Amino acid sequence: MSARIGAHVDQADPLAEAASRDADLVQFFLGDPQSWKKPSVAYAGGAAALRADAEAAGVDLYVHAPYVINVASTNNRIRIPSRKLLQQTLSLAAEIGAQGVIVHGGHVTADDDPSAGLDNWRKCVEGLDLAVPMLIENTAGGTNAMARRLSTLEQLWDAISAASGFEEVGFCLDTCHAHAAGEELAGLVERVSAITGRIDLVHANDSRDGFGSGADRHTTLGQGQVDLDGLAEVVRSAGAPIVVETPGEGHLDDLAWLRRVLAD
């Protein structure tokens, strides 16, 4: 088994959370994911201590950006604070030595031209100081989402590939979101890689809802409606670190399943 695996955990002591799961990596928020407040480090001793202790423990850190961020938006009151909060998150993630910051692709409204959202993403990448990689994540629903369907993801990648700093932009593939968006997991890694050229992180999640539902409701691996054979194919073929974002009480079972699949 070569892939490093872990889970999304509480931010207060992510290293203790990693140890309790025998995890190689952890993902967490830097503050309230539903707030516009400036991100902060909850770990005792702050950013420097977390970085040093993570390095000593051999645990990789990933930061999930707040859900409120939507840099694709044509609404100035959403887009401008989104860019500011994203930059603050990236900068603090660099201080703790994070491997990357995961951010959702965002959306425009039904009245907007989708190309405006794509161009807003390009401008965002141009304006960011990417001290750590930014990993754009596919999303589950939304007719006007930038990263739900592969056809739109291809347009997004075409738009941002022209931006300076693009080399620090990667992709996070979420299996629950792909399932909810109506994307078959079989062959998905190849289809995504043909667009992005890279997969930097996998969110290995099951779904409480049916294929193409558009619903973003994760559940424990094997207890939902995601095809487990397809999920196994994704984690084996992506060649990327893996995070489970499933209910915490099932993390040990989920990580054990991943270890078995990756060992086969």
Enumerate the language-model features and the residues they cover.
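Hydrophobic faces of well-ordered beta-strands that scaffold small-molecule active sites
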Residues: 3-9, 26-28, 61-65, 101-103, ...
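N-terminal pre-domain/capping segments
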Residues: 1-65, 69, 73-88
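C-terminal helical cap(s) of enzyme catalytic domains, especially alpha/beta-barrels
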Residues: 251-264
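Acidic (Asp/Glu)-rich catalytic clusters
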Residues: 16-23, 42-62, 88-97, 126-131, ...
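Active-site beta-loop-alpha junctions enriched in small/polar residues
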Residues: 8-12, 31-33, 66-68, 106-108, ...
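Aromatic/hydrophobic pocket-lining residues that form the small-molecule binding cavity
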Residues: 11, 47, 82, 86, ...
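Gly/Pro-rich active-site loop or hairpin
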Residues: 112, 146-150, 154, 177-241
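Active-site acidic/histidine proton-transfer and metal-coordination neighborhood
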Residues: 55, 71-170, 180
